[in-house]
Design a protein with these regions (language model features):
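ATP-dependent small-molecule kinase phosphotransfer cores
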Residues: 2-76, 86, 99-102, 130
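Low-complexity, compositionally biased segments
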Residues: 19-22, 39, 62, 81, ...
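Residue-level recognition of specific faces of alpha-helices
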Residues: 23, 67-70, 79, 93, ...
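Small-molecule kinase domains that catalyze NTP-dependent phosphoryl transfer to phosphate-bearing small molecules
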Residues: 38-46, 106-149
Length: 149
């Protein structure tokens, strides 16, 4: 069953330099949520792919009431899980996150270190800190999340 991260969908659009990716790169680089209509378009495009025919797991969606309303129109949810974590834990985890430039693998400097510092265990790619994983940007993302979710 595919795991669909809306953050990954956004990053793929930016990486592939699509028209939509160009429009949303400013939002994500400043820690702002991508507009609802854009997120709904990205999600609808993804969940109509063949691997989603028997179901999928959504990560990071819906974040707003309009997104939830649109999701009800395009799909049905069997289960919903909402995880709650303190801001301090979120900031610590995200500011310690490392991402592989090559395969997108995720590591953490404190809790899930790679075998070789700075290198992905899966593909050997370079690990880096995303621009939106800086504490100030994370704090901004949390504020936006609270206002819009």
């Amino acid at each position: 069953m595919p795991h669909i991260s809306t953050g990954d969908l956004v990053r793929d659009e930016i990486k592939n330099q699509t028209e939509m990716g160009k429009q949303i790169s400013d939002y994500s680089s400043h820690g702002l949520l991508v507009p609802d209509n854009v997120m709904c378009q990205l999600l609808q495009k993804r969940i109509t792919q063949p691997d989603c025919a028997r179901g999928f797991i959504l990560d990071g969606f819906p974040r707003t009431i309009p997104q939830a309303q649109e999701l009800e129109k395009i799909s049905t949810a069997d289960f919903v899980i909402n995880l709650q974590v303190t801001d301090a834990v979120i900031i610590e985890r995200l500011s310690s996150r490392l991402t592989c430039r090559k395969c997108g693998g995720i590591y953490n400097e404190r809790s899930l270190k790679p075998s070789i510092s700075g290198r992905c265990d899966k593909c050997g790619g370079e690990l880096y800190h995303r621009d939106d994983d800086k504490p100030a940007v994370i704090q901004q993302r949390l504020e936006v999340y609270r206002k819009q979710t």
